[in-house]
């Protein structure tokens, strides 16, 4: 376990092993309490100390098993280790996400390190790469000095192409086959994602929210595309701010905000968010409906729907009905056939469009899992389409950048359902004041396809379908 913090000596020579025990804690907590009582500010931690390297190695040992989402595993670890201050937690989280974004490089550089040593070596190398070799203290490096020097001396330009791209081989092949600017995509997902927020138009205007954020010392700029969106210049905690607690803003990526606008719901309509999850798009749709009509939020995960409750309370929406269903074939859905004016199918997907903010996902995904998801997508779309009335609009959306989850699914559906027609997505958004360049319109075609390397959003796909009710006559 991690050793107590100690004053750092820079990495020059490393006599002795770095201690790796849980800190005793009593004297340390007493000193912290005395410092707080004196009003003394706690100095920023030196990253490469035995204390933080020990914790970082422990976290990486847990996270790199890839048994679950990194953010969930980090939260569990922090709850178990109360000796970590807020700055420590922030530093550890940043470094863990850095390691996950550069896991292929780390694995290549450390090979053939013994598995038992891998988390500790990965912790040391990640700190050296992210913060500079000088951040490693001698005590933290200890007897690993020779191994670390050898790893840091490896010529990374000799890595295989997929390792340079920081993705598995199979995903590298798919992305490079589909996109001419695949290298731009790989560079984009190597960086962190910005913090985007949507202004709740039921409670504030964009300018009012900007002023309130500015008064709280939070700098924001208006988004390039979303009329309701702001992008924060720096990532900050919003949870304590009244503008967030009172529901005037919600965290939501710009691309996700535009998905709701593609649905373009109107007041007093009957609308369905078929795979609502925690409700980010549900909230945006409800605000566009001005909390009128009926907005059904379906999901197979009752716990996720329950997580929507505090968000709904903050938002001021009272037109949302949350319904947990068994699956897309739930018998209760049959009673709602052809009842809805608008249906959003935010389909389960690989999440490859979110790799900037979920870097572990690329290592937890497999071709077999992708095939399973693909079958579910087609089934969900067919079931959701039955809910739409004639003349209604259906939006099929994913946060994937892979054609087989997007265009291929929709084209197969249209071939089976000639009563549906594809609408031009850019035109739908332009009618609402969202401007795209001519190059972007060419990029989209009839689809909506935002990409991190082109629009600086998460990767999102959507298709806008309308139900005409008129089946074409067979050709004679």
Short names for language-model regions:
Residues 2-240, 339:
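Class I Rossmann-like S-adenosyl-L-methionine
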């Amino acid at each position: 376990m991690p050793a107590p913090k100690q004053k750092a000596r820079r990495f020059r020579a490393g006599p002795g092993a770095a201690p790796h025990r849980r800190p005793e804690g009593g004297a340390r907590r007493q000193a912290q309490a005395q410092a707080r009582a004196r009003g003394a500010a706690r100095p920023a931690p030196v990253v490469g100390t035995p204390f933080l390297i020990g914790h970082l190695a422990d976290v990486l040992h847990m996270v790199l098993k890839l048994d679950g989402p990194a953010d969930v595993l980090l939260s569990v670890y922090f709850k178990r280790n109360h000796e970590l201050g807020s700055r420590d937690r922030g530093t550890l989280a940043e470094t863990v996400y850095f390691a996950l974004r550069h896991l292929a490089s780390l694995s290549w550089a450390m090979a053939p390190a013994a598995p038992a040593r891998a988390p500790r070596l990965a912790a040391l190398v990640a700190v050296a790469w992210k913060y500079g070799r000088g951040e490693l203290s001698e005590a933290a490096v200890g007897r690993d000095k020779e191994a670390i020097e050898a790893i840091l001396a490896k010529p990374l330009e000799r890595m295989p192409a997929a390792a340079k791209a920081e993705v598995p081989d199979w995903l590298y092949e798919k992305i490079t086959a589909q996109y001419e600017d695949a290298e731009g995509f790989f560079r984009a997902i190597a960086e962190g994602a910005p913090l985007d927020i949507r202004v709740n138009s039921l409670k504030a205007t964009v300018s009012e929210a900007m002023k309130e954020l500015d008064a709280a010392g939070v700098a924001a700029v208006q988004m390039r595309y979303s009329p309701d969106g702001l992008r924060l210049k720096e990532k900050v905690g919003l949870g304590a701010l009244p503008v967030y607690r009172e529901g005037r803003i919600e965290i939501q990526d710009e691309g996700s905000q535009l998905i709701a606008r593609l649905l373009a719901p109107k007041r007093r309509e009957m609308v369905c968010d078929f795979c609502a999850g925690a409700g980010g798009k549900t909230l945006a749709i409800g605000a566009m409906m001005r909390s009128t009509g009926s907005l059904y939020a379906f999901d197979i995960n009752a716990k996720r729907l329950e997580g929507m409750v505090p968000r709904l309370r903050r938002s001021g929406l009272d037109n949302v009905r949350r319904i947990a269903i068994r699956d897309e074939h739930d018998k209760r859905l049959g009673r709602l056939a052809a009842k809805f004016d608008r249906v959003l199918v935010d389909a389960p997907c690989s999440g490859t469009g979110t790799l900037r903010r979920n870097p572990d996902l690329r290592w937890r995904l497999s071709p077999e899992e992708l095939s399973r998801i693909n079958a579910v997508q087609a089934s969900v779309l067919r079931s959701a389409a039955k809910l739409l009335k004639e003349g209604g609009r259906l939006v099929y959306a994913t946060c994937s950048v892979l054609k087989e989850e997007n265009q291929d699914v929709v084209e197969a559906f249209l071939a089976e359902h000639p009563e549906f027609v594809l609408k031009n997505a850019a035109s739908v958004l332009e009618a609402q004041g969202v401007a795209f360049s001519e190059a972007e319109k060419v990029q989209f075609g009839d689809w909506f396809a935002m990409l991190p390397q082109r629009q600086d959003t998460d990767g999102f796909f959507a298709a806008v379908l309308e139900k005409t009710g008129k089946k074409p006559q067979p050709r004679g």
